């Protein structure tokens, strides 16, 4: 008997991806706050958990739904960047995110794509230098009038009237299993995706749909919003439909009505500003504008209740007192409970344990979690970046604008927003206890920028791994920056000017003249309004500081093992010197975030300093496109009885001079779509060198890979994909159909060269089978007849007859359990004698009947099938293989424990030939 002992280990990774085409870093951050749930899901895309941002990946796997290559992982992910004032515990607890599905969140810029009122005009996007000033004379074609229309488009659907125009691309953040990025849309339906990829988002209105590179469809049919549904909303994944249309995974939610205020999600927001108003007489007035303290913005976020597929389902059960606090996950297969996960929490806010139970309701294993106390609640005191910096604000009506001291002895009576390391770490995860009862502890420290200045947010400092007896097994500690200086690149230093928006108030009044009343310019007031948070983005990839160099040390104090040095690509954003009026811009001219955080190099040395492994990557930009935007800001406000002069202010010298030719301030910026990919990779491992060079197509797929070994010999692999054939394909051809169904991932042609000599070639031919497109033939060099031929499929897209070159027999299959499992295989014969009625009945049934299986078994003695070999498969209610019957009638049985794990394998006499034990501690 063979015994196997298996141990489950929690994945804690220091991730450092190599290929640029998998990047999901956004080109530009969102300006509008999405719902808390969307923020929690999206941040694992825009704030990647790698050492470039000082983070490690902490994931608790719960369950994975797998259907025809589609994987829906259900997991708890922890983001160890620190807790902000507007973070919410949501389903799992502070810092944790339930990942089970996906979201598409929309934020309007300038005019929304979903305005139902007003009169839409063509987009107005010009270079600032080309916008004509002082042409507001009543002409319908003046540039300054077009800016009026742009500002009008930025209103909500409830207040907009008259003509409007767009000037910026709206943004959709999308995140679903194995895919994330941004999709941009302009009012004229011009669109693009960041990064350029084979994933396509379309129908991006009130029911967005995405297709992945295999042609699988993801539908997002349930929505939440903050009430202004035309400018800010999130859609949630409701269906995944396989490319062959044979399988659908359903996501069910409890939708929340706006009247159910106790069920809404209330996100903390800070709105109040502090203004200085300087008039012509040299008098300065100051005022607080807006509601002080921390207020709330409400979202009607739906609650995930169930994920189901063909009799299998995952149920999510919540607290009866806290509707969004997840208490239990129950996993069923074919109606049978196979396992459950129960959560223990403190105050519904901190996850203390995740306990896994089998079908017999007995605990199998668990994870435990400990934290650095609790973060302050309510009217908390915060630093410049939104992290906690003290026990509480001095008053529930405190002014959260920083207490800056400004030129001319001006002061703002706001809060002290400086960083406090101790309070920033409150509520952070510090320990995970594994099912083995071993555990890992985590130590964090604040980010450090140039010159050692501390910045908001946390980075990993140290991880210690202990066994169940509390003995240290391994230690990892991290040194950041060039030469381990501890310093990275701060995105922006704190500057009061970044918090300030400026405007100009102009009084217009009537005065008697020789020919009647005339319009005169009266009082002029300059306004500086200071906000609680900077208008310019202080984050890149979600972090206040990024690190181009990080060194990881490993070992124990008694036995150091060496170190690993990581080097990442790092580019600063490119900023304008100012707006049209010379003020600070909110958005950089070009954001280079999409090129940052790529693994440039990795060097591993042992404890003697000897290099045992090294990797060096060279990158290049591909498929780059820059899209111009025009951001327009209100600046001059003409008020008073003669305010109508603003419609023709250019005809009045005083007003045209005072406004400097425009009522607005504006600037350009670009959104970049492209990819930053590995061009060449050099690797040294165990004394062996190799170099790999890559070339890509317009969708970022590798079309050529050249491997050069230590001796200088080259092997070249060239691939062609759907888009490479589609360019020259006729309309209606298989390549045309695959292209428009977004089936891009299959390599249709693979050629292998040794030097210049072709040594191997494989061609994969696809066919439109009516309801779906699937593989028909596999051909190889010198065999222009098919080497593998797929002759037929069932209605679920499963192959039913396959033949291979060199084998003088076909292999036929019957699928059961609604196309989820093979129940019979025949070699050298066919199942035609069963007839289509029985075959279809068996395939469609939730479980084949005993009578139908007996008919299939009887084929073993059918004289017409003499010489053929039949194998049958039997499954339990959870679709685990229960019995295998070989062509000679030999039976092998499989038994499982209450958690659905394989426990033992028995021969036909009941003798155990293999057993499995799982290394958990109770």
What are these regions (language model features)?
Residues 232-233, 300, 322-324, 347-349, ...:
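Edge/loop elements at the starts and ends of beta-strands within beta-rich repeat scaffolds
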Residues 335-342, 363, 472-474, 611-613, ...:
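Amphipathic hydrophobic-ligand
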Residues 277, 381-405, 488-522, 610-612, ...:
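Low-complexity, serine/threonine/proline-enriched polar segments
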Residues 1-24:
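Bacterial Sec-dependent N-terminal signal peptides
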């Amino acid at each position: 008997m063979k015994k196997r002992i298996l141990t489950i280990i929690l994945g804690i990774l220091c991730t450092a991806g190599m290929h640029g085409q998998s990047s999901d870093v956004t080109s530009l951050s969102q300006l509008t706050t999405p719902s808390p749930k969307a923020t929690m899901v999206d941040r694992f895309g825009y704030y990647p958990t790698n050492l470039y941002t000082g983070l490690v990946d902490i994931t608790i796997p719960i369950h994975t739904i797998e259907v025809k290559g589609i994987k829906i992982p259900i997991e708890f992910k922890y983001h160890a960047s620190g807790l902000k004032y507007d973070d919410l515990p949501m389903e799992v607890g502070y810092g944790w995110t339930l990942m089970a599905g996906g979201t598409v969140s929309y934020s309007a810029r300038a005019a929304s794509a979903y305005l139902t009122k007003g009169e839409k005009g063509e987009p107005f996007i010009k270079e600032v230098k080309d916008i004509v000033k002082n042409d507001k004379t009543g002409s319908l074609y003046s540039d300054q009038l077009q800016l009026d229309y742009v500002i009008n488009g930025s209103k909500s659907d409830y207040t907009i009237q008259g003509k409007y125009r767009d000037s910026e691309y709206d943004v959709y953040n999308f995140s679903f299993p194995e895919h994330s990025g941004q999709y941009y849309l302009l009012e004229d339906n011009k669109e693009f995706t960041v990064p350029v990829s084979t994933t396509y988002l379309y129908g991006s209105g009130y029911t967005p749909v995405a297709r992945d590179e295999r042609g699988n469809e993801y539908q997002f049919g349930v929505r939440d919003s903050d009430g202004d549904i035309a400018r800010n909303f999130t859609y949630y994944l409701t269906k995944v439909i396989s490319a062959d249309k044979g399988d659908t995974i359903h996501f069910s939610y409890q939708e929340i009505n706006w009247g159910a205020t106790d069920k809404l999600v209330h996100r903390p927001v800070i709105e109040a500003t502090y203004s200085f108003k300087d008039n012509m007489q040299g008098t300065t007035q100051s005022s607080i504008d807006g509601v002080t303290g921390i207020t709330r913005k409400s979202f009607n976020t739906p609650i995930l209740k169930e994920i189901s597929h063909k009799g299998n389902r995952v149920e999510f059960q919540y607290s009866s007192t806290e509707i969004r606090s997840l208490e239990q996950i129950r996993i069923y297969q074919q109606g049978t409970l196979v396992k459950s996960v129960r959560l223990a929490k403190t105050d519904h806010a901190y996850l203390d344990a995740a306990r896994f139970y089998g079908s017999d309701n007995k605990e199998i294993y668990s994870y435990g979690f400990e934290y650095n106390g609790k973060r302050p609640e309510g009217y908390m005191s915060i630093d410049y970046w939104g992290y906690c910096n003290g026990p509480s604000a001095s008053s529930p009506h405190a002014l959260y604008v920083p207490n800056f001291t400004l030129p001319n002895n001006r002061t703002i009576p706001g809060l002290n927003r400086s960083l406090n390391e101790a309070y920033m770490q409150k509520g952070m995860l510090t320990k995970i206890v594994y099912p083995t009862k071993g555990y890992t502890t985590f130590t964090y420290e604040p980010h450090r920028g140039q010159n050692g200045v501390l910045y908001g947010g946390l980075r990993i400092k140290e991880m210690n791994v202990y066994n169940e007896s509390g003995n240290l097994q391994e230690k990892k500690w991290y040194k950041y920056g060039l030469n381990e200086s501890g310093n990275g690149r701060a995105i922006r230093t704190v500057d009061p000017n970044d918090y300030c928006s400026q405007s100009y108030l102009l009084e217009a009044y009537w005065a008697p003249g020789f020919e009647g009343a005339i319009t005169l310019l009266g009082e002029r007031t300059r306004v500086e309004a200071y906000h609680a948070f900077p208008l310019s983005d202080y984050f890149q990839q979600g972090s206040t500081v990024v690190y181009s160099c990080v060194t990881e040390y490993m070992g124990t104090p008694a036995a150091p093992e060496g170190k690993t040095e990581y080097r990442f690509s790092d580019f600063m954003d490119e900023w304008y010197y100012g707006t049209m009026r010379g003020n600070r811009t909110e958005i950089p001219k070009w954001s280079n975030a999409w090129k940052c955080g790529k693994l440039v190099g990795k060097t591993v040395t042992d404890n003697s300093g000897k290099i045992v492994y090294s990797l060096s990557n060279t990158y290049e930009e591909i498929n780059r496109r820059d899209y111009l935007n025009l951001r327009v800001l209100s600046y001059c406000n003409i008020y008073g009885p003669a305010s109508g002069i603003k419609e023709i202010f250019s005809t009045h010298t005083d007003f045209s001079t005072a406004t400097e030719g425009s009522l607005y301030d504006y600037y350009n910026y670009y959104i970049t779509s492209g990819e930053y990919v590995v061009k060449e990779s050099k690797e040294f491992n165990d004394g062996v060198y190799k170099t790999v060079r890559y070339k890509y197509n317009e969708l970022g797929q590798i079309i050529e890979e050249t491997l050069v070994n230590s001796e200088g010999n080259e092997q070249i692999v060239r691939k062609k994909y759907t888009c490479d054939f589609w360019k020259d394909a006729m309309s209606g051809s298989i390549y045309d159909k695959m292209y428009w169904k977004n089936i891009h991932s299959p390599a249709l042609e693979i050629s292998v060269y040794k030097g210049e000599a072709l040594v191997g070639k494989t061609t994969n031919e696809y066919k439109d089978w009516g309801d779906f497109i699937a593989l028909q033939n596999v051909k190889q060099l010198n065999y222009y007849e098919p080497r593998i031929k797929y002759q037929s499929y069932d209605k679920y897209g499963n192959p039913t007859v396959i033949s291979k070159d060199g084998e003088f027999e076909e292999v036929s299959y019957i699928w059961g359990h609604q196309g989820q499992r093979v129940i019979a295989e025949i070699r050298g014969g066919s199942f035609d004698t069963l007839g289509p009625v029985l075959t279809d009945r068996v395939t469609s049934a939730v479980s084949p009947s005993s009578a139908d299986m007996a008919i299939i078994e009887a084929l073993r003695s059918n004289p017409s099938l003499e010489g053929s070999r039949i194998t049958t498969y039997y499954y339990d209610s959870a679709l685990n293989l229960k019995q295998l019957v070989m062509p000679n009638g030999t039976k092998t049985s499989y038994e499982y424990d209450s958690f659905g794990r394989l426990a033992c394998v028995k021969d036909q006499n009941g003798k155990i030939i293999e057993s499995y034990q799982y290394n958990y501690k109770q």
